[in-house]
């Protein structure tokens, strides 16, 4: 049975298995609702001072170092996703490491059980050959920012095609069978869908009409964020057709171009960045929720509009009357995620934490709850997922990476810089220990 969450200004009411529970909240000194506990400790899955890359052989490692293709101080993890094998084996945890510089030996990896001095060892996925050309082979993977794993055991990979912000290959969407590494689908974006030397595709969001275990996950729309190109691309997988959405709602706001995290600031003007959609079965018109990283506006548009190419032939004037400005946060929000009951989660920069908003309520500060605050462990949540485990329980998984220190050059590799954390959705929303 689904858990149903009702938010009001001061109370969270839960109806679960026929019983009703409530939990009061306290008014936070920044004007947000917050639970009474000061700092939330999520379950620590991984932490590292730096990333530990494994190689097929010691010779491969030495070659990468010699050619400048591996710089231990260059990589930065951006996203995380989890695959629970149907056989009941231990979950596989995947991370992305975009090639901001030349020194990233591979851009998509999984965590092993091998612990090394700086953290758990990574290994390339699907294998080293997919990454070793460093942009010379566009049938491989060049630079992956984020991924999404579906309920059919497939990984949807958005490859920006860049290394050190230079376009080597066209941006592409690659769908791999996780168990076999077989390519199930590939779509290279046509030139009309991206802006050469400007675009940078960083986030895919896949909305699937025929999910597993009974469906094949082939009827899907994919929304691909292009923050530097200030827009996003919609891709109809079944018909292999795409169109671009770009207007004032997908742009950055200069007033939010300065990002401050834990007292350190950097400048970044990024447009469209993160997506979520209305879950099925809630009785609502389904919407695509999106926001720009360098903006405080939360925007929505009906899925039946954004998924129809007939609306998108008039440039920046296309379908303007269908966009809904839900509200403004007054602060930047990075990676979002959505629970099955309609709680929109996002990692805010200030205060440093995860906020929740019930989509049945207006997007106001009274209805945005500070669910987890931790100025140490949650410094820039660059990847955030809601994943259903084999027991049917929803979990929040995230990666935090202290992005401000990478931008300012103050990363201290004697400290823990990167974390993968998780918490049950029920525990997060109820303020219980993870």
Where in the sequence are the language-model features?
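Cleavable N-terminal signal peptides of Sec/SRP-targeted secreted and luminal proteins
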Residues: 2-20, 173
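Beta-strand-rich domains and repeat architectures in extracellular enzymes and scaffolds
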Residues: 25-106, 145-146
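Surface-exposed loop and turn segments in beta-propeller and other repeat-based domains
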Residues: 38-71, 119-139, 183-199, 242-267, ...
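Beta-rich, blade/repeat-based domains predominating
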Residues: 71-90, 134-155, 193-222, 251-287, ...
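Blade-loop segments of beta-propeller domains
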Residues: 76, 107-164, 187-192
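Beta-propeller blade signature
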Residues: 106-116, 170-182, 232-240, 412-428
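Short loop/turn segments immediately following beta-strands, especially the blade-tip
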Residues: 111-117, 179, 237-243, 301-314, ...
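Blade-level signature of beta-propeller repeat domains, shared across WD40, Kelch, NHL, RCC1
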Residues: 381-434
